[in-house]
C-alpha cells in the first residue's frame, strides 16, 4: 500500500514555473514561512501547484542563500573527491558546498563535469600511449642496432679465427667438397620454398634415394618412431637402408616452425622408453629427457637459393 497523494493531481498545474508564481511563493515564505506544512501551502497562497512542487521550487531555486551560475575549480575538486569516496550521494556532497543543492550538483555532474573529466582522461591516456610508443620505438631500434653490431663483430672474429687456424689448401678442399655434396643432394629433386632439408649425417654422401610416401612422422621406420599420436607433421621420407647406420637418413618436412613445439608436446604426453632417430633408446617422461633433443633436430644444411 503506497503513500496517499498530497493533492488532487488533476486539479494542479504542471510544467515550468512562471515568473508570477515564483514571486508569489517567494514573497509568502519570506513573510510567513512554510508553517511546516507544504501540502496546505498552495491553498494558502492561492496557486494551483502541488505541495511537493512548491517545496522543491523553494529549496532548489528560490532560497535567498543559493548560488547560481557556474561552479568554481575548487567546487569541482570537492565534488570529484567526494564522488570517488562516497559515490553519487548528492545530498551529502551538497552539505559540503554551501549554497549548492543536491539537484544542482547532480545535474552539473551528469551534464558537464563527468564529460570534462573523461575528455581530459582520454587526452592524458593518448599522450601516455604516444610517449610509451616513442620510448618503445627508440628502445627497439637501439636493441636492434646493438644486436646487429654484436652479430657483425662475432662474424668477423669467427672468420678471422678460421683464417688463422685452417690451412688455405684445406679451406679450398672443404669448399669444393661441400659444393659436390650440395649438387648431389639437390640435383635429383625440385626445390620447394615451403620445405626444409634435414641431414642427420653430414659426413656421408648420398648415392641414390628411394621415395616412400609417408603421411606423418609415425609412418617412418620402426627404429625412428617417437610417438603414436602425432599426425599433423606431413612429410616425404627418403632413405637408402634403415638397417645401415652408415648411410644418411634425410627427409623433407613441411611446417618446420611447428615441428619442435609439436615434438616437445609429444614428449610431454608420453612416459615410455622409445627409440631415437639414430636407433638408441631414450627415456621420456613428463619432466625428464635422457637424450638431448638437440642431437636429432638439425638446422637446414643449405639456404634456399
From Swiss-Prot:
Which InterPro entries does this one have? Homeodomain-like_sf, Myb_dom, SANT/Myb
Q: Which tissues show it?
A: Expressed in roots, leaves, internodes, shoot tips and flowers.
Q: Enumerate the Pfam families for this protein.
A: Myb_DNA-binding
Q: Where in the cell is it found?
A: Nucleus
| Source organism, top-level taxon | Eukaryota
What does the UniProt keyword field contain? Activator, Developmental protein, DNA-binding, Nucleus, Repeat, Repressor, Transcription, Transcription regulation
Gene Ontology molecular-function annotations: DNA binding; DNA-binding transcription factor activity
Which SMART domains does the UniProt entry name for this protein? SANT
Nucleus as a keyword of this entry, yes or no, is: yes
* Keyword Repressor annotated: yes
Q: Residue ranges of the HTH myb-type domain?
A: 9-66, 67-117
| DNA-binding region, residues | 38-62, 90-113
> Which coarse location class describes where this protein primarily resides?
nucleus
Q: Which GO terms describe its biological process?
A: plant-type cell wall organization
One Gene Ontology cellular component annotation?
nucleus
Reported function:
Transcription factor that functions as a regulator of genes affecting cell wall organization and remodeling. Activates genes related to the primary cell wall and represses genes related to the secondary cell wall and expansins. Required for the regulation of longitudinal cell growth in stems, leaves, petioles, roots, flowers and siliques.
Q: What protein does this entry describe?
A: Transcription factor MYB87
Q: Which organism is it from?
A: Arabidopsis thaliana
Name of the gene encoding the protein in the UniProt record? MYB87
Amino acid at each position: 500500500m503506497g503513500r496517499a497523494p498530497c493533492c488532487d493531481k488533476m486539479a494542479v498545474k504542471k510544467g515550468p514555473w512562471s515568473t508570477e508564481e515564483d514571486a508569489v511563493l517567494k514573497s509568502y515564505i519570506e513573510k510567513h514561512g512554510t508553517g511546516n506544512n507544504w501540502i496546505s501551502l498552495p491553498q494558502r497562497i492561492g496557486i494551483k501547484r502541488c505541495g511537493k512542487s512548491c517545496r522543491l521550487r523553494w529549496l532548489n531555486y528560490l532560497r535567498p542563500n543559493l548560488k547560481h551560475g557556474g561552479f568554481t575549480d575548487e567546487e569541482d575538486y570537492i565534488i570529484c573527491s567526494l564522488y570517488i569516496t562516497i559515490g553519487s550521494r548528492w545530498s551529502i556532497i551538497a552539505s559540503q558546498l554551501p549554497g549548492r543543492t543536491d539537484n544542482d550538483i547532480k545535474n552539473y555532474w551528469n551534464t558537464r563535469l563527468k564529460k570534462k573529466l573523461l575528455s581530459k582522461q582520454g587526452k592524458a591516456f593518448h599522450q601516455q600511449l604516444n610517449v610509451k610508443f616513442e620510448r618503445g620505438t627508440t628502445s627497439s631500434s637501439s636493441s636492434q642496432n646493438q644486436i646487429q653490431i654484436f652479430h657483425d663483430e662475432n662474424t668477423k672474429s669467427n672468420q678471422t679465427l678460421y683464417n688463422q687456424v685452417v690451412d688455405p689448401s684445406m679451406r679450398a678442399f672443404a669448399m669444393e667438397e661441400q659444393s659436390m655434396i650440395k649438387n648431389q643432394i639437390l640435383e635429383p629433386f625440385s626445390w620447394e620454398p615451403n620445405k626444409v632439408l634435414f641431414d642427420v649425417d653430414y659426413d656421408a654422401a648420398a648415392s641414390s634415394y628411394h621415395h616412400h610416401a609417408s603421411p606423418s612422422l609415425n609412418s617412418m621406420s620402426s627404429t625412428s618412431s617417437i610417438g603414436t599420436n602425432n599426425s599433423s607433421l606431413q612429410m616425404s621420407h627418403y632413405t637408402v637402408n634403415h638397417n645401415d647406420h652408415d648411410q644418411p637418413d634425410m627427409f623433407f618436412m613441411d611446417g618446420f616452425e611447428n615441428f619442435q613445439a609439436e615434438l616437445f608436446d609429444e614428449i610431454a604426453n608420453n612416459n615410455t622408453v622409445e627409440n631415437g632417430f639414430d636407433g638408441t633408446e631414450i627415456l621420456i617422461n613428463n619432466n625428464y629427457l635422457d637424450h638431448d633433443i638437440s642431437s636429432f633436430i638439425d638446422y637446414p644444411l643449405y639456404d634456399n637459393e
